[in-house]
A protein has these predicted regions:
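Long, low-complexity, highly charged intrinsically disordered regions
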Residues: 79-238, 319-341
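HEAT-repeat alpha-solenoid elements in large eukaryotic scaffold proteins
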Residues: 1-4, 41-50, 200-211, 224-231, ...
Length: 341
């Protein structure tokens, strides 16, 4: 759908064809006797494609675009929050960052983009250099595409909770971290996640691709290291289980530290401190993954860490999350060490 949306920008297909596609996808929300996850899936498909083509549709098909957004707004108003939301949260508390459901978050981001007249800054558009040629291109009308009817055997996108670790106060003053409801935040995170999914089993290419992402983006300077760390931990802590083996995340984070030694290790250490501070409300499975990754990471740096900074854990009961995390980390460190270390 996103590919078809970008084809509108290159004048390959007409705006009307894309509007018809969006309408057919959104009409799924009006079907009877279907699971909510089906409606969520097709609404997300439309919302995630809008940033690429919303400006063009706003200029040429404003009324039709408004009608689609009003239909989505009506659906979001009557929609019930998934029962799995609390089970998928990394933290049991919304302090300091609310843990939003993925569909509610992108709807808030699209609503803010709409208020800003559909202006975004971080989508790479190489075709703008050929605008003089493309403006004369013959646009094509695509045959109507309708979603298949629901079958009990259908598998839809699993519900997700958006992981948030940093905000602008955690970043250097010279950088600007887009807000959680900024579409720029979604675009950057989505592109980094795409790079990770594409290259996760080639750690060097994956790390290089992530760090080179800003070379393709347009707009203000952003603290890319912070966004990368947040995306990586969000993938690592995904519930009920992470998409890839834990070693994928750990090895890529190591290569990121090697490729960007002046800044990335410091940002990663800052993230570890924030995670440690919030262990009290962290999901138990995520604490275990955190300890396993941290021990692996330390094993590649001679197990060096400012352990004195965590002496506060001595004041708690042994089963409190903080001393328990430290104990598990040390156990993993023992497994990863050998006599000469």
């Amino acid at each position: 759908v996103r590919f078809l949306a970008d084809l509108v920008n290159t004048r390959v297909i007409s705006c009307g064809s894309l509007i018809n596609l969006f309408e057919n996808l959104v009409d799924v929300t009006m079907e009877d006797n279907i699971p909510q996850v089906r409606s969520d899936y097709f609404v997300f498909m439309v919302l995630s494609a809008l940033p690429w083509v919303s400006k063009e549709l706003y200029e040429k098909k404003e009324q039709e675009l408004d009608q689609i957004l009003n239909t989505i707004d009506s659906y979001m108003t009557k929609r019930t929050k998934t029962q799995f939301h609390s089970a998928l949260k990394v933290w049991h508390s919304d302090n300091p960052h609310p843990q939003e459901e993925y569909l509610g978050c992108i709807w808030n981001q699209i609503s803010k983009l709409r208020e800003e007249k559909w202006i975004e800054h971080h989508i790479y558009r190489p075709y703008i250099h050929f605008d003089n040629v493309l403006c004369e291109a013959l646009q094509h009308n695509v045959s109507p595409i309708k979603p298949p009817t629901h079958e009990p055997s259908n598998i839809y996108q699993y519900p997700q909770v958006v992981f948030r670790l940093f905000d602008y106060t955690d970043c250097p003053e010279r950088s600007i971290l887009p807000g959680s409801h900024s579409i720029d935040r979604f675009v950057i995170e989505d592109n980094l996640r795409w790079i990770f999914n594409l290259n996760c089993f080639d750690r060097k290419d994956c790390a290089t691709g992530m760090l080179n992402y800003l070379n393709l983006s347009i707009g203000s300077k952003i603290p890319l290291e912070y966004v990368i760390v947040e995306v990586m931990f969000g993938e690592m802590f995904a519930l009920p289980k992470s998409k890839f083996p834990e070693i994928c995340y750990g090895s890529i984070l190591l290569d990121l530290c090697k490729l960007q030694p002046s800044t990335f290790p410091q940002v990663l250490a800052q993230a570890v401190e924030l995670l440690f501070d919030r262990l009290d409300t962290m999901n138990g499975a995520c604490i275990n993954r955190f300890a396993s990754w941290f021990a692996y990471h330390l094993s590649n740096f001679q197990f060096r860490w400012n352990w004195d900074d965590w002496s506060i854990a001595l004041k708690y009961e042994p089963l409190h999350p903080k001393p328990k995390f430290i104990a598990e980390t040390l156990q993993y460190c023992l497994r990863l060490s050998y006599h000469t270390k």
